[in-house]
Amino acid sequence: MANSDKEFIVAVELGSSKISGIAGKKKDGTMQILAYAEEKTVGCVKRGVVYNIEKTYQSVNNIIAKLEAVLKTKISRAYVGLGGQSVRSYKCVIKRNLLTQSYITNEAIDAIRQESYEIPFNDYEVLENFPQEYVVDSSIIADPVGVMGTNIEGEFLDVIAKSNLRTNIETVFANAGVAIAEGLISPLQLANNVLTDAEKRSGCALVDLGADTTTLVVYKNNIVRYLVTIPLGCSNINKDLATLPIDDAETEDVKLKYGDACQDTDMSEEADPQFYTTSDGRQIDRKSVV
């Protein structure tokens, strides 16, 4: 293993159905993907949150080992996604009286924003903070620096999560001997990769349906306006299918092959197949699945 891991960028995502790791290298201004590995998260991650540290550590350790085998170097640091049921947004307003009319400085704005980070939440921490708008003496201003005023009010969107979300992940990676380069909020990283600046500017919502959770992120004027995580995902469909005479292990296969969200699905007798045959020979009417 002669190469240095500083040449590569490694990221790990801890999802409810799988833990995945990817390694790449910047080349000519683009990211070249060099290695990918994943492990099923059986009994260790629930609704995006690590609840069995030992099993999660074993999966992360296996993924790191697979990536190292391809890269031919030891991985000492990785970027890690932060997600899960507790991740959501919270709006807060910070007000300051400047006592006398004066120019608003960068330092004053930074102090107000820092105060929004420090608002106490029971068992929660602020992961990120997004300024929404400022009000200077009753006038709404996008950038108040340099404006004269006596009173300033800042509205911020705090993205918060339960404190154990980060601490459990930190414990897992410490056990694996891998430093966390940065914890990145997964829904926002996804949005940065799939949404254009024009879409964020004009206003849009991004919905990501995962195994145990669904996240919704709303943008307007290139600013994050809302984020919520709903405890509902694709696994709920599997649970519904499990009420049919289908083995739990086959529900995912049935869902992918025959599931359809459209009501105009062809259910005529000419449609093929009309039945799903289970591994033990039982037949399930396709109408029960769609």
Please give the residue ranges for each predicted region.
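Nucleotide/phosphate-binding catalytic cleft detector across ATP-hydrolyzing
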Residues: 1-18, 22-205, 223-225, 234, ...
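Glycine-rich phosphate-binding loop of actin/hexokinase-like ATP-binding domains
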Residues: 202-243
